[in-house]
Amino acid sequence: MIKQLTVIFVMMGLWVCGAQSDESEQHKERKQMKVIMKTSMGDIQLALDAEKAPKTVENFLQYVKKGHYTDTIFHRVMDGFMIQGGGFTADMQQKPAPEKVENEAANGLANATGTIAMARTMDPHSASAQFFINVNDNTFLNYPGQDGWGYCVFGEVVEGMDVVNQIKGVATGNAGPHQNVPKEAVVITSIDVVADGE
């Protein structure tokens, strides 16, 4: 199977006023759209930036609403780099993820600690469902990156960074052709959109 993240070690009057206010509120709602990721090690809440990465957020939410992430795992964990998940089950079976998204890494968002970005193959527009959470400031992944594209950031952890830090420290090993796989599965039990007021 193709490894998802290729990295070289060493993204008019009162009516007008009213309309602008409505647009401002809608803009605010988009900026503050959140999801909660429940894992076997605790909850992680993420704020998604639909203003700067609209296609990526839409694609991610489509997978969320379909329940794609339920019972997937963090299958690649590298302390000092990132934790990657959303594509495999605990028995390392890859889930089908046919919908791809255009690379939006040139959106000004950096692969800083605590941000979430899309994993992909060497094809810059191959991102589908797999994502990773940066546990370091991975500036080499930012647009234009080493391949002229970089990796698209589309949100950040707003609660539960302690959980991310626990995950990054788990013991890992090999599972078939896959490296850096947690020896004890870190399961994503669900990802859901956070309701207003939560």
Model-derived regions: residue spans:
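Hydrophobic h-region of N-terminal signal peptides that target proteins for export
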Residues: V10-G18
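Sec-dependent signal peptide recognition
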Residues: I2-I8
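Cyclophilin-like peptidyl-prolyl cis-trans isomerases
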Residues: L5, C17-E198
